[in-house]
Amino acid sequence: MPVVTLPDGSKREYEAPVRVADVAQSIGSGLAKAALGGIVDGQMVDTSFVIDKDSHLAIITDKSPEALEIVRHSTAHLLAYAVKELFPEAQVTIGPVIENGFYYDFSYHRPFTPDDLVALEKKMTELAKKDEPVVRTVMPRDEAVEFFKQQGENYKAELIASIPQGEDVSLYAEGKFTDLCRGPHVPSTGKLKVFKLMKLAGAYWRGDSKNEMLQRIYGTAWLRKEDQDAYLHMLEESEKRDHRRLGKQLDLFHFQEEAPGLIFWHPKGWSIWQEVEQYMRRVYQNEGYQEVKAPQILDRGLWEKSGHWDNYKENMFTTESENRAYALKPMNCPGHVQIYNSGLHSYRELPLRFGEFGQCHRNEPSGALHGLMRVRGFTQDDGHIFCTEDQIQSEVAAFDKAVRAVYQDFGFTEVAVKLALRPAKRVGDDAIWDKAEDALRGALKASGQEWEELPGEGAFYGPKIEYHLKDSIGRTWQCGTIQVDFSMPARLGAEYVAEDNSRKTPVMLHRAIVGSLERFIGILIENHAGNMPVWLAPTQAVVLNISGNSAAYAQKVQQSLKKQGFRVESDLRNEKITYKIREHALQKIPFLLVVGDKESESNTVAVRARGGVDLGVMPLDAFVARLQQDISQKVGPEPS
């Protein structure tokens, strides 16, 4: 007689084992109809799952945060079902849920086409409308291997054969299609109403380039049409804002084959880079950091001591000289420990804060490179704090305050905090990790922050707090981090003289606010759609003369503004003023200053703000005041 405890604490007793669907029905027919799955004692299950002992149960409906995962997983199976209906000779492989959707990989004798996607989506809609039940069965591994071999599904048979002998596997059937899956899935295909196939790509079987190239179909699925419409609009906006396209349009940077994953900064792009660097340098100074510079190439022996050689070698660029092995640094931390170790330190000096704009290199796979967002060479605002255990909480709290102020200045007001915990591959014992994770939890709690925990996603040397920014079109970007490291200082021999004259190992906090400057600039470009705030804009204003008569005055205005420290250009070409205005508007210049005979005679400028906003004619000093205000407040002008 199982007793089922519901989320509100109420209990229901049943005379025999009962399905999740039956519990939902006993509560109400509306809930039974809305049920997509359940959570039994913390585990997501199908509505067909049988509860045979006292358990806690939450019914998953379209209002539950877990609903999207079930719907997307089920829609991936619906796609595979449709492929087998339209292309019976295709073989199915795997189809997981990913962020905002799913994909499924297939083996087929010819490439799928965009027209095939249209036909498949139509078939998926047709199959969903049949509202066929999704039925779970369990069978022994060997029996499942034979089942899929008989179906001609060799990839599925290979997957199951890799499972240890003697284990059972679960299969899900809908109509004529059966797939291997752990589940859970929706109770019937009729629950799948909102989906779209997005694109085609290639993928190697099991991610190994030695294996066959499969065809990957990406899709998205949602609970409500308005959510999907918003997502598709966001994708459309993302394409318009793509920093690679804007980088070319605005003449900021470029890439070329001779330097994969490395950036050629043009003058305008480098201007943005320098503004970000100088801003972050002031943050270092205001927060009590001493700026340092460590070598980019270090001996293999140091990387072995730090743990990078064993845990990160595949991502490092290595070289040899005079029978010694070296590596380009992928991280700055070992170098900062060497600077710390160059002298003897007292507890009175702690916390000791080092900061560097450290240039790092990581051997990223060529297929993973993506504009400024994923590169092989980048610069971090990388800092390391050497402190005692008792100082961790106050240092993390101070960092948290600083990081939020920085993001506010760059235009990000929504920031989510996540705590990444120990990964499977790591240095240090569990006691050290317990201490490090508890220290970060305590600091966040003391700072009054809410946070989400991410098991397994910490760095190999320590847990970390991550700061995730939401941009202007709703996407999130992980930027800032602060990590507790009890391991590396000990591995590299860092010490300080304690109050009792004993030698102790300091705690090291790894911290970065923007992270990779290159990536952060890519995020800024996309967040602002290229309309950089005045303080960051490579060119803050352009002076345009209406005719040759006003060319000298235009030059005078430009020179006056440049002497006051503003980034100003002049356009004295013999072109129509409307043409020049349009051309510079496409370059997203914050302010255009139009001068003709009247302005020359009255020492004024006609000001047009970005987006075609006419601010009228004003004395040059008045425009300077407006420019200074926008720069100091780190704002606009916003495009209309």
UniProtKB/Swiss-Prot annotation:
Residues 242-533 are annotated as: Catalytic. It is found in: Cytoplasm. PROSITE patterns: AA_TRNA_LIGASE_II, TGS. GO terms for biological process: threonyl-tRNA aminoacylation. Its main location: cytoplasm. Its EC number is 6.1.1.3. It is an enzyme of class 6 (ligase). InterPro entries: aa-tRNA-synt_IIb (IPR002314), aa-tRNA-synth_II (IPR006195), aa-tRNA-synth_II/BPL/LPL (IPR045864), Anticodon-bd (IPR004154), Anticodon-bd_dom_sf (IPR036621), Beta-grasp_dom_sf (IPR012675), TGS (IPR004095), TGS-like (IPR012676). It catalyses: tRNA(Thr) + L-threonine + ATP = L-threonyl-tRNA(Thr) + AMP + diphosphate + H(+). Residues 1-61 form the TGS domain. SMART domains: tRNA_SAD (SM00863). Its cofactor is Zn(2+). GO terms for molecular function: ATP binding; metal ion binding; threonine-tRNA ligase activity; tRNA binding. The keyword Repeat does not apply. One of its GO terms (cellular component) is cytosol. Binds 1 zinc ion per subunit. Keywords: Aminoacyl-tRNA synthetase, ATP-binding, Cytoplasm, Ligase, Metal-binding, Nucleotide-binding, Protein biosynthesis, RNA-binding, tRNA-binding, Zinc. It comes from the Bacteria. Zn(2+) binds at residues 333, 384, 510. Catalyzes the attachment of threonine to tRNA(Thr) in a two-step reaction: L-threonine is first activated by ATP to form Thr-AMP and then transferred to the acceptor end of tRNA(Thr). Also edits incorrectly charged L-seryl-tRNA(Thr). Homodimer. NCBIfam families: thrS. Belongs to the class-II aminoacyl-tRNA synthetase family. This is Threonine--tRNA ligase.
